A protein has these predicted regions:
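Class I S-adenosyl-L-methionine-dependent methyltransferase catalytic core
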Residues: 1-127
Length: 127
């Protein structure tokens, strides 16, 4: 990436306008001290709709959550339920949960998505 935000820069408070964003947020839930995954999902949705950016998220597939229904199912254009479990540390430690790739965008990426079919099951949620 040409530009990235760490905890120090507080990516949630930055304007992402004009960017293509990859977001792999903390998987934790919101606390009084720290934003949670739902805050990042809301930010990606908002930036896509208000600033016309493309945001690609890699997050746990939590289809039962409010943010999944209110933001992802309601506003994302594409979602991929990743095949298998992501593996970390040279494949020795698979994630204890399924993952999904969520794309918030105003653009059409149908052809590019076809080339990523080996990652899992892709769904186009809206035109």
């Amino acid at each position: 990436c040409d530009k990235f935000y760490t905890v120090r820069e507080d990516g949630l408070s930055q304007n992402w306008g004009g960017q293509v964003v990859f977001c792999n947020p903390p998987y934790s839930r919101r606390t009084k001290k720290n934003p949670g995954q739902e805050d990042w999902i809301e930010k990606c949705c908002s930036e896509s709709e208000n600033n016309k950016i493309t945001a690609v998220m890699l997050i746990p597939a939590r289809t039962d959550t409010k943010s999944q229904h209110d933001y992802i199912f309601a506003h994302a254009k594409y979602i991929c339920f990743v095949k298998g479990r992501l593996k970390f540390n040279d494949g020795a430690d698979p994630a204890p949960f399924p993952s999904e790739i969520v794309v918030f965008t105003q653009q059409d990426f149908d052809e590019k998505i076809k080339g990523l079919s080996d990652l899992g099951f892709w769904i186009k949620l809206r035109e």
